[in-house]
A protein has these predicted regions:
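Intracellular juxtamembrane helix-capping segments at the cytosolic ends
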Residues: 8-22, 219-233
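Loop-to-transmembrane helix entry/capping segments in MFS-fold secondary transporters
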Residues: 19, 23-34, 149-150, 232-244, ...
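Helix-loop-helix hairpin linking two adjacent transmembrane segments in secondary transporters
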Residues: 24, 30-90
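Helix-to-loop junctions at the C-terminal end of transmembrane segments
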Residues: 50, 166-179, 263-264
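Juxtamembrane intracellular "pre-TM" segments in multi-pass secondary transporters
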Residues: 88-119
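Extracytoplasmic gate region of multi-pass secondary transporters
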Residues: 109-165
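C-terminal transmembrane helical hairpin of 12-TM major facilitator-type secondary transporters
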Residues: 174-224
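A late C-terminal transmembrane helix in Major Facilitator Superfamily
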Residues: 231-270, 275
Length: 297
């Protein structure tokens, strides 16, 4: 719980900070691509440590995690040491005369609250889709597609690799199309791939489809952060993006649990219609956002 709390704070800070940089889609794409890369490499490293060679105890991987946490601490301190509250308030004065605190202004006062809540709900659904697919795809491939253990495990690796590559490559495409249009294209493509994954009962077709799903899902989180920075006044960026990222992160707990509970009763094949429905919901939420005007640097 404490680790999740700390990472949530750091996640919000990094997203808000980079979202205000020049070329934020590209830079955020690289930032979130490393998340996907970690999701690919960590299980492979942990499995190798436990099963190969000297077969180290399972808890040995926690030493690797501690080392990564030290690196995260060092980079965060270096980036934000001078970014005190006083510096932030001086650099981001209010653009109106309201006496509300910034969090209340972001969550309650229209029109800013509309953007904050739409982005938060969008990220809630997106993170739920990402983690539910990444977590349940192996079981689906084993039980429904009758895959071998190794090949089924590699489909999850392919999904996370798709997310990593998509965040890098599409991070350069998204700003040229505009965030609103780009995501309105990526999501229907993802839904089409989800239908192929669901309705074509071939192992390799499903494996390829889920990898490309990851590719088109990858840029959604960075694009939502960039959209929030363009639609909200600068003094609300940290409050609104921090809330949206934290609220969205709860999707990683809610939706995989819900899928698991339903799968327990109905079978893991329920994964596909649930994912398809969630994709439709977040597409609707995205289309409800106001028109995004080109950001003037």
């Amino acid at each position: 719980m404490l680790a999740g709390f700390g990472n949530g704070l750091a996640d919000a800070a990094w997203n808000a900070w980079i979202g205000n940089m020049a070329n934020p889609n590209e830079v955020l794409g690289f930032l979130h691509a490393f998340y996907g890369l970690g999701a690919v490499l960590s299980p492979l490293i942990a499995t190798t440590m436990i099963t190969k060679g000297s077969k180290l105890p399972w808890y040995t991987f926690y030493y690797v995690m501690i080392a990564m946490a030290v690196i995260e601490l060092a980079t965060s301190v270096t980036a934000f040491w001078r970014e005190t509250g006083a510096v932030f308030l001086a650099a981001n004065p209010r653009t109106n005369n309201t006496k509300d605190n910034r969090m209340k202004e972001a969550l309650v006062r229209l029109p800013n609250a509309r953007v904050t809540w739409l982005c938060a709900l969008f990220l809630l659904g997106y993170v739920g889709i990402e983690v539910a697919l990444g977590g349940w795809i192996v079981k689906f491939m084993l039980e429904v597609r009758d895959g071998e253990d190794f090949a089924s495990g590699m489909t999850a690796t392919g999904f996370w690799m798709g997310i990593t590559v998509g965040r890098i490559i599409l991070g350069f495409v998204t700003p040229r199309l505009g965030e609103k249009l780009a995501i309105a294209i990526y999501l229907p493509l993802t839904m089409a791939l989800e239908l192929i994954f669901w309705l074509v009962p071939q192992f390799y077709v499903s494996a390829v489809a889920v990898s490309f799903q990851g590719f088109f899902l990858g840029p959604l989180f960075p694009a939502a952060v960039v959209a929030a920075t363009k639609l909200l006044p600068r003094h609300l960026h940290v409050s609104a993006i921090g809330f949206a990222a934290a609220f969205g992160g709860s999707g990683a707990a809610i939706f995989p649990f819900a899928v698991g509970a339903i799968a327990q009763a109905k079978g893991v094949q329920v994964l596909q219609p649930i994912i398809l429905a969630l994709l439709g919901v977040i597409l609707g939420l995205w289309l409800c956002l106001p028109r995004i005007h080109k950001k003037q640097e």
